[in-house]
Amino acid sequence: MTIFKAASPEGTRDKLFAECLRLRGIRSSLMELFSSRSYKEIMTPELEYYDLFVRAENPLPQETMFKLVDRSGRLLVMRPDCTAPIARLVASHFKDAEGPFRLCYDETVFRSAAGLDGADSELPQCGVELIGAPGLRGDIEIVSLAVDAVRSAGLRDFRLELGHADFFFGLTEELGLSREDEEALRACIESRSFALLDELVAGYSGEAAQCLRRLPYLFGGPEILDEAAALTSNPRALAAVERLRDIWRELVSAGRGDCISFDLGLVQGLDYYTGVIFRCWTPGAPSSVLAGGRYDRLLCDFGLELAGAGFAVYVGALASCFECPEPEAAKTLIFYESGCLAEAVALLGGGAELSCFATEAESLEYARRAGMKLLVVSKNGIKEVDPNV
């Protein structure tokens, strides 16, 4: 039997100094931004009941979840998503409170990456959830904060793509598609499988079918909204276009329009989202660095009629966009005599470290090998010793 003692599990890896500094810096910048916008940090357990993630609206396949059993035989999972646990938290702790609730988090989700070479199973995320703000202003707040979040991490070359779930659902509703056909159509659009898309829509005629055929091509600048509106007279789809236009106008007036584009074929996770959808891309990142949207039905599962919107920043993907130098090695070694620890500790900082050697001579030899200067702290004071003399 192979003993896996010196290796980390598939989808996980050790992270060393420079990467840790980069990740910590991004997380700190994001959480500081969220706090400045009155979002309050919460934490949910890394272990949750499996039942929380198997609702009809849940887009996460159960095979991606890490499962285990508690001592009572109940099925648990390592948290594969942050939004559903936060919905549970709101229902448990704020059921009788008046919203809106502005919540933020810095947590890790766990998803099996089996079969995906190099993919991570541990995914650090920082994100926000705005609960109880159903209208346009809630959408604007979340989308503008998403732009500011990416900028606060130091990224300048990025595109935030906006879409809307109701554009797709308005068209499929008009055609009277079954849930199975709707999901098959969504998968084709997501994967840009144009031939299969034509095949699925071939049995339908009319304006809605033609518009669905065009859906994978409806991406670009604000002119795409005009093109989309010209393709359909469906009220639900047109309302979605107008909502995107309203968000766009406000972002432009706030100086955040230069990084915005539109993708009406943005249909990932449509079982989850009910309104605006967005994700952020940047050159050099292996995947999107941020994703979010509106999910007004999620809280209904917990008996609350509250709208929700939010996003998650994928910290690992974002960190891969930056170079981070290795932390500098200590330049000063401090040897202290017995009874002088307090004085020695007061000298730490700025690239100094305490000597672990028992004698000044051993400390001097180590400092020579490491190219450090040596400070000796005694009851007579502090002296600097040149290791090379």
Segments predicted by a language model, with ranges:
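TRNA-binding/sensing appendages of the translation machinery
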Residues: 1-84, 140, 161
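Extended alpha-helical scaffolds
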Residues: 152-160, 165-168, 181, 195
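Positively charged, Gly/Ser-enriched RNA/tRNA-binding surfaces
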Residues: 19-37, 48-49, 83-95, 103-155, ...
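Short, basic, helix/turn surface patches
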Residues: 67-78, 187-190, 378-389
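Beta-rich nucleic-acid/ligand-interaction surfaces
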Residues: 44-62, 163-173, 266-274, 362-365
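Acidic, His- and aromatic-enriched active-site or binding-groove loops in soluble protein domains
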Residues: 64-70, 176-199, 256
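Hydrophobic mid-domain F-helix/FG-region of cytochrome P450s
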Residues: 145-152, 166-176
